[in-house]
């Protein structure tokens, strides 16, 4: 049996060396980005939060709504950084996980913060002047307050990626392996909760926008609590006569058909009148034509217990998107 050549490395050693290189690279990236993150957190905490508190330019409720738990997040970074600088990744991230709830609170406040910022910049001239002065400081490097406010949520995604990479490239026999694995799991769970909060906020924005487009008494509260999927114009093909354009709003549980108000309507020009609300749990969907990807559009058939809809589009790609979205809505209700 031949012995390995002198200087040759076995596959296990090579794998360990790759892990160690990736671990060192990830650890360096975590440290360098944490320093920059803490610096930017400090800019907002020092030049905005602290000075606004001292000057009283904003009332306490408005200041709290604008910045949320910013100073506590800054403090959590100040606790973490010395551990990273000392190479104690597992211990540092394990302790940092005690502060993850701050990121959930911050995410829940994002839309309120954005609204307060826009309102105060518009109506509070003292605040507007203060913001311009602070943003003009050389320390900000041209960054505006609105650029810095999303930082914690962006950083949480980086924490997740880096913590997972550190855990994956730390050997199971390392004393830090258990700490890093647990930290990566907790950070990933928090990132998922934050993502869910963001999705709900976007959906609420869609619902508010759509509600503003719908007019008439029967439209009030019609879409409250629903999950928005898609909207757009489609042609309704009647049994006799010409196809009629209608605006459709698709939610996870219902399809709303609306008719545009006349352009010369005194009070409701530019809005839509609700014509029907179809339950997706009772829908049977078929693609009549438009399977081939040709240029001539397509036709969808939607059957409900007491009505059948034929929906047409001259844009086959658009119709394919509708078919996919309708299929998702139907399956979500039947599951």
From Swiss-Prot:
GO terms for molecular function: guanyl-nucleotide exchange factor activity. Promotes cell proliferation. PANTHER family: RHO GUANINE NUCLEOTIDE EXCHANGE FACTOR 39 (PTHR47056:SF1). The keyword Hydrolase does not apply. This is Rho guanine nucleotide exchange factor 39. Residues 227-331 form the PH domain. Its main location: membrane. It comes from Bos taurus (Bovine). The gene is ARHGEF39. Residues 22-197 form the DH domain. One of its GO terms (cellular component) is plasma membrane. It is found in: Cell membrane. Pfam families: RhoGEF. Keywords: Cell membrane, Guanine-nucleotide releasing factor, Membrane. The keyword Cell membrane applies. One of its GO terms (biological process) is positive regulation of cell migration. It comes from the Eukaryota.
